[in-house]
Amino acid sequence: AGCQQFLPEGITLDEFKSTEINPNVGIMQSQKVGPAIADDITQSAVWAVLAALLGIFLYVLARFRNFAFSVGALTGLAHNTLIVLGAYALLWKVMPFSMEIDQAFIAAILTVIGYSINDTVVIFDRVREYTSLYPKRDRKQNINDALNHTLSRTFSTSMSTLVVLVAIFCFGGETIRGFVFALLIGVVVGTYSSLCVATPLAFDIQEAMDRRKAKKAELKK
């Protein structure tokens, strides 16, 4: 009854839905997105994220020639991805806007991965520079100085990005708020992980590799 006023005169709802009675009036075409298509989209999204992580791992390895840096960067990016996914899972029915896991969300995840690696590479590059300038100095001191000298640059870049994202979130409209919300979380977490996850982990891995080499050298003697 509620839809009758929108139907052509003399056409019932059943006649409108039927494609056999009058093919020129009514529902001309309909499609259903079934579980098979949804599974295909999910699988493609997972492969896209894994391909991005693998590509960045190989890029860092080729640029710095250091396995510890590659593992540290990859762990930081995986950490960022899981935090964004966890935030969406926790706040899915809490936030007053759409937070569906769709193509826009996957695009946000890939954007966060690309943004986060930028800060990490800058820090790693400064660590490599200090290691070349002061090869005899303690590695921990070189990493600490690298973090201190890139801290202002990291925070300035992140804050300018956050200001833009907050403006888009507030005034950009309802349809993109879920996408921008994922970026907001990703930028904050990515800044933290570059400073407090990727770099310290790279240091720990390098120290462990050095200890293993020292033990092997002692055994050969």
Where is each model-derived feature located?
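A structural signal for conserved, well-ordered secondary-structure elements
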Residues: 1-221
